[in-house]
Amino acid sequence: VEVVAERLPLTLHAYRLLTAAATPLAPVLVSYRLKHGKELPERLTERYGESTVARPPGPLVWVHGASVGELLAVIPLIERICEKDFAVLCTSGTVTSANLAEQRLPKGAIHQFVILDTPRFVDRFFDHWKPDLAIFVESDLWPNLIVTSAGRGIPLILVNGRLSERSFNRWRRVPGTIAALLGCFDLCLAQSDAHAGRYRDLGASHIVTTGNLKLDVPEPPAQADGLAALKAAVGERTIIAGASTHAGEETMLVEAHRRLRGAFPRLLTMIAPRHPDRGPGILEIAHAAGLDATLRSRGELPGSETEIYIADTLGELGLIYRLAPIVFVGGSLASHGGQNPIEPIKLGAAILHGPNVWNFAEIYAALGNSHGAQEVTDAGTFAERVGAWLQDANERRTVAKAARETVAALGGGLERTLAALEPYLMQIRLERRASNA
């Protein structure tokens, strides 16, 4: 590690010194996060690089992604790596992603919370897990983790690499810093040529465009009993949904429902917030608008009078997408860059979104070109488009079909990513075989 650290720019030297000095304050930060529901009390030590889980024998691939979106994108890749008889350690930073990992990771994969990025905790993490290969997903770049990986001679690969124009412009202000971090990576696998070009401009080498892994995710699962119960509760009612919504978007959906219910009196709007703990606040918004609303987290199903059904639970978007022929994908009216439209598209929904979709810019551009999605800007344009689709099911089906065909044509990133990783996996196998001889 020291050899790599000697070549770092002053900014990263300063970062390493500051994070080392801040190590005694770590319990204060973790305690604050625990109070705000951002940590699991039984797993706090993982943030300090301590684990109650033993390292499995044999070769170990470490995969790190920030949160739910990155984890969902990489689960099929993890499954394929496990099939090759590698153990996989998966780290992420949020409680929601930890819950998702518990539900969806394959046998042979272990989840841990990512450590706080201080030299002491990072060294403790590496001393315990001793990964043979490190894979970072998209854009969650922690300097001490990256520098230590390189310093210990662990091959480091970026998969599904994404660098928005906004992030690119920020990194350009510290060119030496980002060039040093990207220089630690043996291989950068980018989502598109545009992202690859930005990485190249910032100093990365060995860049390959492999495509977006999120295009190859399977349909989200739905628990059979839960789906049957929800279907029975809604009956023949007309359903629209808002998925992975952020603050402000629920107000738009509630207002749009008020505008639509005169023409469609049996309309039911389902809202699945990105952060389920916001459910009670959304309930208040609906009640303030004079609408009958209920929360799924209370074990309630929509009744005949329910107008807004708030699905404030984790891992149940598959239920919503199987019932709603029209889905608004959140994070796109709010300035969050948009959430993933792929899953509802694969389940046959017609997609609406706001103008802020830079997280999935290439996908939305392709959907726009194929007329596979429609942009809305407020409750008025949303209600107008939904009303038109509810009156003309053929038009709605045409849009949904165009979206499915577009997503299918853009796919293949998983196989290209696996092909790029295979030489590294083969090298690990050979080294293990030689050490056991």
Walk through the language-model features, giving the residues of each.
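N-terminal membrane-anchoring alpha-helices
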Residues: 2-46
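C-terminal amphipathic helix plus adjacent low-complexity
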Residues: 5-9, 258, 391-437
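Active-site and donor-binding regions of nucleotide-sugar-utilizing enzymes
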Residues: 27-224, 245-246, 260, 264-265, ...
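Charged active-site motifs of nucleotide-sugar-dependent glycosyltransferases
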Residues: 56-62, 233-240, 250-251, 265-268
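Nucleotide-activated donor-binding/catalytic signature segment of Leloir-type glycosyltransferases, i.e.
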Residues: 101, 105-113, 283-311
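Acidic donor-binding loop of glycosyltransferase active sites
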Residues: 129-133, 306-336
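Conserved sugar-transfer catalytic core signal across GT-A, GT-B, and GT-C glycosyltransferases
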Residues: 145, 249, 316, 339-340, ...
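Catalytic binding pocket for nucleotide-activated donors in carbohydrate/polymer assembly enzymes
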Residues: 185, 201, 322-406
